Amino acid sequence: MVFDQNTANLPRKNLKSAFGQYIFSRQKELILYLVAPCSGERILDVNCDTGDHLQIFKEKWCSVTGINPSAQILQKVKNKLGADTEIVAGKADDLPFSDNEFDIVTLINVLETAKNPKKVLSEAIRVCRGRVFIGFLNNLTLAGTKQRLKELFGLPLSQEIRFFRLNEIKCMVEGTIGNTKIKWGSVLYFPAFVYSFFEELEEMLPLENNPLGAFTGLVVPVKYTFQTIQTPLMESFNMNRKAQRAAPGTARDMVQEMQK
């Protein structure tokens, strides 16, 4: 089991506060800046927790899917986002989806609670055909103690959480898919008390390539070798042994993808 269903990513009560809303607004800004979602793209949010991250992409007219091992959490997400939101019960280390099924896959505060982060990352990459977004709590930030950060980001205080460094995540990515161009950034650079009188200071600093933030995000481009067919063939085709030729639009398309 990858997640503790009773504690992993509990509903974020702090989001109801003004500062909690500010924290989420900064996360949202970073996510949209790095991911740049387009209308109609398919998005999978792994361990979709309260549905807040799915809402970000739904507002951009994406087709959203959330997965979580908890039926209770999934029902809350469904109630919050509506019937057009697809929710699936499942585990992050064994995603019940086809290869390269989604344009975007997000892992937001997921690796921190995963028993096997490399396996979770590998599965996210497998089902993606575009880009994977990884959002995590920065081990090197000066914004607060680890317990304070867990509280601010709605993570269970009693559970042991793994805090990552940016280089650790990069090495994990490169160990999975090899060298690739990674775009990254961070937000929330200061202790909480600073924002009560100098909120503008945060927004004066750049998002991209900034290692100071408590919440760090990076986007990993995913290029598949073979594309799994996600749409049905619209024309009938008579297959038989003597014909010895492929159905139109299958093997030919695979070869074209490899030659790009």
Regions found by a protein language model. Name each.
Residues L44, D49-D94:
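Class I SAM-dependent methyltransferase SAM/SAH-binding core
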Residues N109-E112:
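Short catalytic micro-motifs in class I SAM-dependent methyltransferases
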Residues E160-W184, T216:
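Short alpha-helix
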